[in-house]
Regions:
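Detector for small/aliphatic-rich hydrophobic stretches
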Residues: 2-175
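Short Gly/aromatic-enriched secondary-structure transition segments
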Residues: 98-103, 226-235, 289-298
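Internal alpha/beta scaffold segment
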Residues: 275, 282-307
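Extracytoplasmic/secreted cell-surface and envelope-processing proteins
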Residues: 94-98, 286-289, 322-324, 376, ...
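Non-catalytic, conformational "gating/processing" segments within enzyme and secreted inhibitor domains
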Residues: 111, 116-278, 308-387
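Primarily extracytoplasmic ectodomains and periplasmic/lumenal surface modules that are beta-strand-rich
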Residues: 90-94, 155, 219-223, 275, ...
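C-terminal soluble interaction/assembly domains
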Residues: 359-425
Length: 425
């Protein structure tokens, strides 16, 4: 594998953290002085389970709304954070609809997101780690958020303060109608994904006032690596029944395993045990993207309770880089059809000018090999104005389309959810 967080921000008024641009994506970054990032223990965040369930539900909507003839990689947690940032500036019915999708309202919503993100803080690291030849010895989960404001737009100071306090988001100003503004967005995306995603999906527009950006990057070794000698070309059956050959890893050892309603699943922890990957194989002929949030929840619960069994596991290596996902149909399906500029949302907490969502995208990548996993995603919302072991008796062969979910061990928050229909690379 070419090797390929939560940023605490102690930030009243807006003050510059860096003065000159150059090539630094943080240049020109601003944050609110005197603001301390919200710190909430998991035990006191009463709405955390409902936010996790809502994230799982949104992830299944993302899978279902993506093109049905290709691989899908999503980060439902990243979209939820971006929507949480948008909710800080929403009012009235718009806020109510956002909070229905987010799974919690008011202070409970803020506390849940702070607690969820806080569980990942200790795994933060330099996103450039993915450019090295080897995966890091301990997992890196890097989270970052920012708001880019058009340099002619009077954004509400209270809104920027809320984003800094609740999400650690810094602020940059740029001409969002120009290529210069695009370069600011691109540089931030490239930096916080270690170059895995090199450009923003947002397009310059004279009506664009604010862009919200959320990034997540993961680089983690398997707790027990696959043996390189066990990888070989093996058969994989595509959705249409075509059989192809793809590089497939093999393992025969004790692995946590469960079966739910005909779906078979294995859980592979990463080093340290704070995050894991659930590999989920649907019944033959069933599209993995047809999974329901209820079934995902049942599978997760079953794996939580399951004991390791001696299992022969065959899993394709992956190098998946889908096209950017347009989030408008996803969010409309999820219940947010009235955020857009052909409706009349209330985003007056962000600032004046009859604001509405004009662009929303997610880009994500997923790489899996014998050593571990690298994944990254960026969600952007543009707001416009106007000794030979015993032979296992049980075998789980991922030789047809399947799901892969990466989640926090402590909270089960789904960080990445992918439907693999063709693992060739």
């Amino acid at each position: 594998m070419a090797r390929f967080a939560w940023r605490g921000v102690a930030l009243a008024l807006v003050v510059p953290l860096a003065a000159c641009a150059g090539g630094d994506p943080q240049a020109g970054m601003e944050s609110a002085a005197g603001v301390v990032l919200r710190d909430v223990p998991v035990e006191t965040a009463s709405s955390l389970p409902s936010v996790v369930a809502a994230t799982r539900k949104l992830g299944t909507v993302m899978l279902a709304e993506a093109p049905a003839d290709d691989n899908v990689v999503t980060s439902p947690s990243s979209v939820m954070v971006a929507l949480g940032m948008l909710a800080e500036g929403a009012r009235g019915t718009t806020l109510s609809e956002l909070e229905a999708v987010l799974g919690a309202a008011g202070t409970r919503r803020k506390d849940a997101f702070a607690a969820l993100r806080g569980t990942l803080l200790r795994m933060d690291g330099d996103p450039a780690v993915v450019k090295k030849d080897e995966l890091p010895d301990v997992p890196v989960v890097h989270l970052a958020d920012q708001v880019v404001v058009d340099d002619a737009y009077p954004v509400a100071a209270d809104y920027l303060k809320a984003l800094a306090e609740d999400f650690g988001a810094g602020t940059q100003k740029a001409d969002l109608a120009s290529a210069d503004g695009k370069r600011v967005l691109d540089a931030w995306v490239n930096h916080h994904t270690g170059g895995l995603i090199d450009k923003s999906a947002i397009e310059p527009d004279p009506y664009l006032k604010v862009v919200l950006q959320d990034a997540i990057l993961l680089a983690a070794r398997w707790e027990t690596p696959f043996l390189a000698g066990g990888t070989a070309p093996r058969r994989f059956t595509l959705t249409d029944g075509t059989q192809v050959s793809t590089e497939t890893m093999g393992a025969a050892r004790e692995i946590t395993y469960a079966e739910v309603d005909g779906w078979r699943a294995a859980r592979l922890p990463y080093v340290g045990g704070e995050i894991y990957a659930d590999l989920i194989l649907p019944p033959s002929g069933v599209d993995p993207a047809s999974v329901t949030p209820e079934l995902l929840g049942k599978v997760a619960a079953a794996l939580d309770k399951a004991q390791p069994v001696l299992l022969k596991l065959l899993l394709p290596s992956l190098d998946i880089k889908p096209e950017a996902m347009k989030l408008q149909p996803v969010l409309a399906k999820a219940g947010l059809a009235r955020l857009w500029c052909d409706t009349d949302p209330d985003l007056t907490g962000i600032g004046p000018g009859g604001l509405c969502v004009s662009q929303a995208f997610q880009r994500a990548v997923l790489k899996v090999d014998e050593e571990g996993t690298i994944a990254a995603a960026v969600t952007e919302i543009g707001v416009s104005g106007t000794s030979a072991p015993a032979e296992p008796e049980l075998e789980l062969r991922f030789d047809r389309p399947f799901l892969m979910q990466i989640a926090s061990s402590q909270t089960s928050w789904p960080l990445f959810l992918a439907a693999i229909r063709d693992p060739r690379h």
